[in-house]
Amino acid sequence: MKLYNYQLIIEYIGTNFVGWQIQKRGVSIQGEIQKVLRKFIKKDLKLLGSGRTDSGVHALGQSAHFIINHKIKPKKILKTLNHFLKKKGISILSIKNKKQDFHSRFSAKERKYLYVIINREAPLTLYRNKAWHIRNKLNFNLMKRGAKILEGKHNFSAYRSSSCGAKSPIRTLKKIQIK
């Protein structure tokens, strides 16, 4: 039986979610998308993401994939998914047919993160739930010096859980910008 592997690129506002991964309590991004996919495709499937996000974390382009035993029309399912997910703050940016060996997590070549800090006294309006609000004055020169120390290859063993499945604790931080 031939299997078809489909990649989704996903954007979401994570404020009202427990994170990416399905959990016993709370609503997850993975769970919401998987529910709509199963309803539309009428098959049991598992949506696998490129990584897990914590509660309240947003994504601009997270990769996920699922494998099924029949072809689908990506444009049609894209419209359907977005119709049912838009009210939840989830958008599917694209769906692509991939090779059998593609895996969202293990095929990823890099991950990009954006942390937004707004440094002012006034409360956040437009960036509420989308930025870290720091009222105390920040020392940007010191922050830039610290960022330079973090750039490069480092061993992150101290930050891993004992059940971490990653092959290596070594990671390379290519670029950190403080603006």
Feature annotation, model-predicted:
Residues M1-K179:
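Structured-RNA-binding interfaces characteristic of tRNA pseudouridine synthases
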